[in-house]
Amino acid sequence: MIRQTIFSIADNDTNKMMSGELFEIHDNLLKVVSLDGHRISIRNIELKNSYGSRKVIVPGKTLQEISKIIGGESEAEVEISFTQNHVVFEFGNTLVVSRLIEGEYFRIDQMLSSDYETKVTVNKRELLDCIDRATLLIKEGDKKPIIINIADGSMELKIKSQIGSMDEEIIISKEGRDLLIGFNPKFLIDALRVIEDEQVDLYFMNAKAPCFIKDEQQSYIYLILPVNFNAVA
């Protein structure tokens, strides 16, 4: 849960809300949300029991420490409890207490449109490996976008930098319009790495609107804003 959302909190404390994650409990559902202004990560988890409604903002630094302690134990059971101003995480013989971030979290519901003009279903590993290869051509600190050209039956991924260029195609299933769109490759990689499904669905409206990566049950939703780009020859 933490590993699947922590990467999209803000790197600095300029906006304290972006430096934490929203934990929203309603009945037997826990929604965890993080965002940094360029992307939103959402995980919906079904709980064993039902609880009263509650919204709290947990500091990202606390969650990062917990993630380090838990390590690769993805099935580790964590008990979470709240006081008025604090959150308590208990797992194994470890107890972590942290002060909550005060304030009201961002209202993101209006950003989560279910409308789309293009839907792509693609093998997650093929897409992730292709984008990983593209990043080898990007110098550290360079903000080169990866350009994705979606057409019937194929997704073309291009990148061009001072180091070199890449142009690869992946077989896909597509519904709707063709599309040419650019992204920060790191944002796509971060989301794809924590999705366990073999096939992933990507939803697009147009080249200026966010991409949504989500499953049918919406147990995960990743919103990623596109970037402007110059056409790659």
Across the structure, where does each feature detected by a protein language model lie?
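Glycine-rich, pocket-lining loop/helix-strand segments that form or immediately flank
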Residues: E104
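DNA polymerase processivity clamps
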Residues: M1-I42, N49-I101, Y116-A233
